[in-house]
Every structure is written in structure tokens, then in C-alpha cells.
């Protein structure tokens, strides 16, 4: 009863504090913004100071309040024991389950992503019948997993099936050319990920020649692509598939280590994989999240798994030094997700020491100090590495504006931030809170007794890890609150509900055993059994949903082959060949002109798909400028004109979109620069980046 009171009071306090924070003004200096941000972007700037405060403050405050209320209600229970009877506990436990059930119904009926939307988005329109059938079908395997004693055989079967799924996903994903599609959403988001890699591969430097929103991953990718044979679409597909398979492997290994029931582990991990990295149903490949932002939290899961199974203290010490370097590497890859990895790892180390030594031990405080120091060291190694690579490539150093360009643009300026509405995120947060609700009471009990923890460390360590990853990764949705953006976190909830089933099952068995004993407590045991069964049913429905999605994706791929839903998004309108795209037409036009009219010299491409065109024509990026896809500031737009002025002896190609923005942002600067050139040719092209015909203007120096 103490824990239920603590949970309710913590939630109520957080809701009240969150409501008060909603009145915090943004205090944005729009006059200053107008001086530096281009009009198109300024119209989409929606700074969310209040929402950011709510997220950061309440994420930290909730567990603190929970633990504080536990200690408060413990003292109250000694003075007023009638407030904390077993009967009241059974009532409030049922009320909690009832509230969660009502919230699920409301979200599926009234939210920004209702049942019909989710049904079509994930379940091919089959919906609830498939969910229920899947939930029923996995009851027997779960029961069998709890009964079997042949652990070695289970492990072998587990990894054979996991390997088959990982190979299946790799083959399907690695066969795709992400440029060869007429789906603008897919190509546009892929291009934002790809062009920095191509630019780095041709000798350009992040922060000097261009700014990259998503971090310094291009340096790592270029190194891998060189091993594969170079920066091209075939190797890029292999790289993406490899990263996604690594993420899937991390989910499988984490589940194998921390689930006792290996069948349940396989079901949860498979559901997580197909709801996240192996989303092979529709064209929802958002490369900026899977694999870019998801890889570091996944690596954190595998690092924690390995550390957990290591028993030798010396091996653990060496491994934790290695982990410090790994997470510095993660920060270098992508700072936003890298910092989540650093926090999760530090939290895990502290939790392990709390389990080992209790809360009164100096060892715990030493562990906290070490975790802070190693986290700072990881950040320092990241910053030093960035500066060394930049200086080695360009002979210059870069500052915070270049290192944290994406963070300062989006979170700092509020670009494309959206208010959070009533949606699925509520259910995902409930899963995170449920994970902490399993852990925090047991930690509080151990702290009160002044002893080291003697409970189920395996289950609770996993729940803690997933909850911290979930709350950390939720920051992405807080900023970019598109209804579907929160779907990238469903995999965390799937793994959590699997672990919750494993935790609830022994409780249910205990209550059923008590029901068989004839005494006055049978009604209470029955009430507890009903509540626990309801929790398990809710969790089973989530697992049923994830399992049905995985099954339908695999069946669709196996049954329909090259005509599967997934494959159809890579079929060009022209049907000429699998790798054909309309971008090839533009590249051919530019190549033909340069050979006939420009002595074979590649013009500077100040166009939207510049990296693709240069790749097709086997040319390097021969100018330093910010790509149109990342134009946020006036200075970004001016980089096109700057490169025209820097070298007045070379031809250049510019498109309608760029000219429109340049004319709006710096018309005089453009007119002055273009005086040194004459228009040589106009290419008209049906561009996938905008409906209708686009024009591409080829300018040559006047002396030519």
C-alpha cells in the first residue's frame, strides 16, 4: 500500500508541477531571430521552453519524489496502520489497472494516432483480431519456457532463430538502392543522412566546409565504406543493413541475458526488432533515427549485458575502461544519442554498486564519483577527437556552434518543434513508469534496512536500463512531437512488457497457491490474482501486437517476393531497371553538357541533389557550401553565393529552389556575384523534390 500511495502522490505532484511549468513564457527575441533565420524556417520556429522544462525537470523529479514519498508513508504507516491494510491495497491495485485500461481505450479512440491509424500503419488493416490471436498463440510458448529445464538446448534454438531473422533482415535491406525511389519522403530523409558522408569521402571537413545536423558519424562511415570499396549506393545499403542488424543483435543479446524465460525473450526481442530497425512494411525508413540515433543506446544495452555476465573483477575493470572509450566513440557518432548511452552506463554502474554494497556504503559514493568522472572523460575524449580530426584535415579548429550545430538549431532555436498532443506517448510513458515502479520500492526497502539488495537483480537491472533509455530517448519526441515520431520508442516498451510479464508471473502463481489455502484471506488473494492477471493480459496484448507485426512482415516478404509491400517502394515509375531514378536523367544532362561545352570539367552543383549527381557522374564535391536541405540561417544561403565569388573561373549549376531562396534572402549579393557569369543553358526536369517541372540554370564565366 505504501508503494501505491507513493506512486499516486508522485504522479499527482508531477502533473501539478507540469501544469505550473506550462505557464513559463518562451521569452524569444523574435527581432534577433529575424536577423539570422530565413523566413521559411522562421515560420516553423516554435520554441518550447515550457515543454523542455517539463521534460527535463519531471524526468529527474519523478523517481526522487517516489523515493521520498516511500519514506514518508513508511513513517505514517507506523502511526496509522489502518490506512495501509491489505484490503485497501487490493482495491487500489485494481483501480490502477482500471485507470490504465481506460487510458488505453481513450488513446485508441480519441488520440492523434487512434486505433484505425495504428491498424493501417502496422497491421495491414487486420487489427484487433490478429492482436488477440497472436496474444493467445504465445501463451503456450511462454508456459513452456517457464517449464523447460533444458537451458542449453533453448539457448541454441534461440540463437539459431535469431540468426535466421538477422540474416533475413540483412538480405532484404542491403538489396535496396535508397536513391532509386520516387518516394520523396524516403529519398529526402536518406539524402540528409547521405550527403555529409559523400562530402567527407571527397575530402571535405565537417564544421569547415559544411555543417552537419546529425554529428560526426560521416567520418566513421567513410572509413567503413572504404573497406567495402568506396562511397556508393551499393555499399551504403550494406552499411545501413549492417548497422540495423547490429541493433537487432543488441536487442537479442540483451533479452537473452536478462530474461529467464528464453522463449519470452525471443518473442519480445523479435517484436522489438520488427517494430523498430527491421520495419519492412511501409516506407517508414527514417535513417536519421534507425540506425543513426538508435545505434548508441543499443550498444549501451550490449555493453551492460556483457558487463553483467562478467564475474572476474579484473576483467570487469578493463571492460569498464573500454566502455569509457566506446561511449566517447558514441558521442562522436551522434551527440544526442551518445549522451543517452553515457547516462545509461553511468546509471547502471551506480545501480550495480547499490546492489552490491547497499546505500550506507562508501563504495556507493565512490562509484557515483567514478561514474561522473568517466562520463566527463568520455565527453572530453569526444571533443578532443573532433578537434584533432578537424585540424588534421583542414588546419583549423571549430567551436561549439559547429560541433553542436544540430542541437543549437533545433532545441536552441526551436526549429520544427511542435507541441505535444494527446497520443500514444502516454502509454509508452506508462510502460517506463511501470519499469521504475518495479525497481524503486525494492531499492527503498534495501536503503531503509541498510543492507545490500537481495532481490531479483537480473530482472530489475534490465527494467532500469530500458526505463533510462526510454526516458532519455523521449527527448527526441519532446522536440519533434509529430504523432508518429514516438513510434520509434515502442521497441523499449515491448521489451519492458516482456520483463514485466516475467516479474508478474511468479506473483500470480503465489496468489493462486494462496487461494488453495482455506483461510480468511482467500478473497484478498482472489482480488490480487485478478489484478495481476489483468496486468499480464495488457502486457500480452502488447506482445501480441508486436509479434503479429513481425509475422505479417515476414509472410508478406516470403509470399509476395519482389512484389511485397516493402519492395514496391523501391520500384521506379519508369520500370527501366532496379537502380534507375530520375536523378540519373539530371546527372546525364549535366555530364553531357560538361563534356561537350566545358572541356569535360565538372561544374559546381548548387542544386538540391548535388551529392547524388556527383556520385553518379563519378565526380567530387568541388565547392564548400551548406546544402539546401540544411538551410536554416541567412549565412547558410549565402554560402552558395560565396562559392561563386571564391572562384570566378568555373561554371556552376543552380536550381529554381535555390534561386528563389537566394532572391528572398540576399538578392543584392547574388546580383553582384552573377555579373561575372552568363547563362549558358537551362535544363527542365521533373524533380521528385517538388511537384511539377523544375529548372536548372548553367552559368559559365563571362570570359568563356
Predicted regions and their residues:
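Signature aromatic-anchored transmembrane alpha helix within multi-pass, membrane-resident enzymes
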Residues: 372, 376-380, 453-454, 507-558
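Membrane-interface junctions at the ends of membrane-embedded or membrane-associated helices
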Residues: 1-4, 72-85, 141-152, 257-258, ...
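Extracytoplasmic
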Residues: 123-126, 337, 387-395, 537-701
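Start-transfer (signal-anchor) and selected internal transmembrane alpha helices
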Residues: 1-15, 71, 75-99, 123-173
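Transmembrane catalytic cores of multi-pass membrane glycosyltransferases
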Residues: 10-66, 169-219, 227-243, 250, ...
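Transmembrane alpha-helix segments characteristic
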Residues: 89-104, 270, 452-475
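Transmembrane-helix signature of polytopic, membrane-embedded enzymes
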Residues: 251-280, 315-320, 399-400
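Hydrophobic/aromatic-rich transmembrane helices and adjacent perimembrane loops
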Residues: 119-133, 340, 479-526
Amino acid at each position: 500500500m505504501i508503494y501505491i500511495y507513493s506512486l499516486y502522490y508522485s504522479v499527482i505532484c508531477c502533473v501539478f508541477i507540469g501544469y505550473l511549468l506550462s505557464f513559463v513564457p518562451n521569452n524569444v527575441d523574435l527581432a534577433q531571430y529575424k536577423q539570422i533565420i530565413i523566413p521559411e524556417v522562421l515560420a516553423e520556429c516554435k520554441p518550447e521552453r515550457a515543454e523542455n522544462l517539463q521534460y527535463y525537470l519531471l524526468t529527474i523529479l519523478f523517481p526522487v519524489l517516489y523515493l521520498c514519498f516511500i519514506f514518508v508513508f513508511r513513517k505514517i504507516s507506523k502511526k496509522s496502520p489502518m490506512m495501509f491494510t491489505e484490503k485497501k491495497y487490493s482495491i487500489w491495485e485494481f483501480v490502477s489497472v482500471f485507470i490504465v485500461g481506460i487510458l488505453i481505450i481513450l488513446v485508441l479512440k480519441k488520440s492523434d494516432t487512434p486505433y484505425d491509424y495504428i491498424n493501417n500503419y502496422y497491421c495491414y488493416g487486420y487489427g484487433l483480431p490478429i492482436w488477440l490471436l497472436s496474444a493467445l498463440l504465445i501463451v503456450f510458448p511462454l508456459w513452456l519456457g517457464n517449464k523447460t529445464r533444458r537451458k542449453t538446448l533453448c539457448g541454441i534454438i534461440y540463437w539459431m532463430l535469431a540468426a535466421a531473422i538477422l540474416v533475413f533482415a540483412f538480405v532484404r535491406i542491403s538489396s535496396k538502392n535508397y536513391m532509386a525511389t520516387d518516394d520523396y519522403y524516403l529519398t529526402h530523409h536518406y539524402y540528409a543522412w547521405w550527403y555529409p558522408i559523400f562530402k567527407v569521402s571527397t575530402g571535405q571537413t565537417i564544421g569547415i566546409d559544411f555543417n552537419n545536423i546529425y554529428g560526426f558519424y560521416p567520418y566513421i562511415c567513410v572509413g567503413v565504406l572504404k573497406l567495402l570499396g568506396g562511397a556508393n549506393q551499393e555499399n551504403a545499403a550494406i552499411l545501413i543493413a549492417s548497422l540495423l542488424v547490429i541493433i537487432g543483435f543488441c536487442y537479442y543479446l540483451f533479452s537473452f541475458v536478462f530474461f529467464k524465460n528464453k522463449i519470452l525473450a525471443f518473442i519480445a526481442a523479435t517484436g522489438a526488432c520488427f517494430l523498430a530497425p527491421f520495419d519492412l512494411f511501409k516506407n517508414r525508413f527514417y535513417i536519421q533515427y534507425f540506425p543513426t540515433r538508435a545505434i548508441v543506446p543499443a550498444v549501451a544495452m550490449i555493453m551492460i549485458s556483457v558487463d553483467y555476465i562478467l564475474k572476474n573483477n579484473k576483467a570487469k575493470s578493463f571492460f569498464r575502461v573500454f566502455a569509457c572509450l566506446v561511449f566517447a566513440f558514441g558521442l562522436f557518432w551522434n551527440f544526442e544519442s551518445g549522451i543517452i548511452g553515457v547516462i545509461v552506463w553511468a546509471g547502471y554502474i551506480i545501480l550495480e554498486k547499490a546492489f552490491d554494497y547497499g546505500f550506507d556504503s562508501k563504495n556507493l559514493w565512490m562509484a557515483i564519483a567514478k561514474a561522473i568522472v568517466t562520463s566527463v572523460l568520455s565527453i572530453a575524449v569526444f571533443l578532443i577527437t573532433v578537434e584533432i580530426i578537424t585540424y588534421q584535415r583542414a588546419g583549423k579548429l571549430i567551436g561549439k556552434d559547429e560541433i553542436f550545430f544540430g542541437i543549437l538549431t533545433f532545441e536552441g532555436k526551436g526549429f520544427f518543434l511542435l507541441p505535444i498532443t494527446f497520443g500514444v506517448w502516454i502509454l509508452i510513458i506508462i510502460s517506463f513508469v511501470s519499469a521504475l515502479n518495479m525497481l524503486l520500492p525494492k531499492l527503498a526497502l534495501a536503503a531503509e534496512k541498510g543492507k545490500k539488495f537481495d532481490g531479483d537483480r537480473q530482472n530489475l537491472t534490465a527494467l532500469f536500463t530500458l526505463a533510462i533509455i526510454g526516458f532519455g530517448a523521449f527527448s527526441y519526441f519532446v522536440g519533434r512531437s509529430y504523432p508518429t515520431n514516438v513510434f520509434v520508442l515502442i521497441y523499449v516498451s515491448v521489451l519492458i512488457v516482456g520483463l514485466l510479464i516475467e516479474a508478474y508471473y511468479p506473483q500470480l502463481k503465489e496468489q493462486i497457491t494462496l487461494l488453495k489455502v482455506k483461510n480468511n484471506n482467500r478473497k484478498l488473494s482472489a482480488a490480487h490474482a485478478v489484478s495481476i492477471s489483468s496486468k499480464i493480459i495488457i502486457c500480452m496484448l502488447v506482445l501480441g501486437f508486436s509479434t503479429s507485426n513481425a509475422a505479417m512482415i515476414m509472410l508478406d516478404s516470403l509470399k509476395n517476393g519482389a512484389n511485397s509491400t516493402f519492395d514496391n517502394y523501391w520500384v521506379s515509375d519508369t520500370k527501366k531497371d532496379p537502380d534507375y531514378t530520375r536523378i540519373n536523367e539530371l546527372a546525364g544532362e549535366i555530364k553531357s553538357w560538361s563534356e561537350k561545352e566545358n572541356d569535360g570539367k565538372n561544374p559546381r552543383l548548387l542544386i538540391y541533389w548535388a551529392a547524388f549527381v556527383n556520385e553518379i557522374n563519378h565526380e567530387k564535391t568541388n565547392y564548400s557550401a551548406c546544402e539546401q536541405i540544411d538551410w536554416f540561417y541567412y549565412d547558410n544561403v549565402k554560402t552558395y553565393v560565396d562559392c561563386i565569388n571564391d572562384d570566378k573561373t568555373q561554371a556552376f549549376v543552380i536550381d529554381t529552389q535555390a534561386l528563389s531562396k537566394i532572391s528572398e534572402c540576399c538578392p543584392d549579393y547574388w546580383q553582384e556575384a552573377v555579373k561575372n557569369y552568363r547563362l549558358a543553358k537551362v535544363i527542365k526536369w521533373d524533380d521528385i523534390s517538388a511537384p511539377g517541372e523544375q529548372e536548372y540554370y548553367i552559368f559559365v564565366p563571362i570570359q568563356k
